């Protein structure tokens, strides 16, 4: 794309752009002292300014030097690309941050495919650049004029969003960041790829398992058809991506889906979110093992160090309160405001759904399975010793509240409903059944159509 030094009109111009490419500040200063107009010139063919060359090559000192001299941060080259676009393409995060600090416009479109800097960061897989641009989009006039959600889902002239590009190029890190920031997982392309493709179709085409995992975990529909009537499973088969096809097969078990529409899930603190995401990954990994079992495709075996980690986890569980739903794992998540605690897998099972309902805009919020109270927040549970008599367990807290909530058969969620939501959490299902039989045999099955 001509991001280096192309034809120059004079020898001084060539030396000037060459010095910018190499980051030679002394040479630049000397050339500018002899001819200050060099700062305003561009290369002959590609129309690259000194900012374009500095940004594409990661020369932050050169970039800062000319921005301080008043160089326009939104200068465009022959393809209407800005220095910010080139920095995002090449993954030069320092230059991206510097240009954003200089109020570079993130809502400019090039003339090649009408793509923004967000498209370019997603296409080339630069997660740090993507995050920086998204952070800027929440505080710049773009958020007021366009709206953040619209910017995240901006389309190029082929109808491709940044999520489409990240999925097609096999960029799972970018897929995750975009989904967390509101990218529409079910959006259809125009003429990009095959018309009417979703991000899942494009991930199936690229054969990237990690992208497929993340899209499925955020509710991507395996039955959605493109304009040719193909589902993602058919696309993966045609491309000979066997493992991807196995996971996308409509007859295989549904994956657990991150319950993003729930308000308290969107407001999770990082520590609690990490625990629940790990539980989601483990649940879907168990599902994958069952699907791929007996085929020539298999997941990597755990490393030798994983056994010792499991031993440590078992030791930790023995010293802390066990989850009163599964009786298998330590309580790591606390429900607020009631204070009841559960392990992360059981909390996830309470909130998750197996198949999203696109017609349900406002999903019912699950209640605490112990006291039937509403859930305002989920936080990391404080470590509580199982042998500490001064600190009541979740079961004890429930019994104390039994006078206030004597009719446990009412509510939108229950222990009895947890096993069906857990999917592959077989151990949790057994423990959950015991609780259902003893305490809440008549509870209604929860509805989590999100």
Swiss-Prot record:
ANK repeat windows = 11-40, 46-75, 79-108, 113-142, 158-187, 195-225
Q: How is it modified after translation?
A: Phosphorylated by XA21.
User: What domain of life does the native source organism fall in?
Assistant: Eukaryota
Catalysed reactions, semicolon-separated: S-ubiquitinyl-[E2 ubiquitin-conjugating enzyme]-L-cysteine + [acceptor protein]-L-lysine = [E2 ubiquitin-conjugating enzyme]-L-cysteine + N(6)-ubiquitinyl-[acceptor protein]-L-lysine
* BP-aspect Gene Ontology terms: defense response to bacterium; protein autoubiquitination
What are the record keywords, sorted? ANK repeat, Metal-binding, Plant defense, Repeat, Transferase, Ubl conjugation pathway, Zinc, Zinc-finger
Annotated protein name in UniProt: E3 ubiquitin-protein ligase XB3
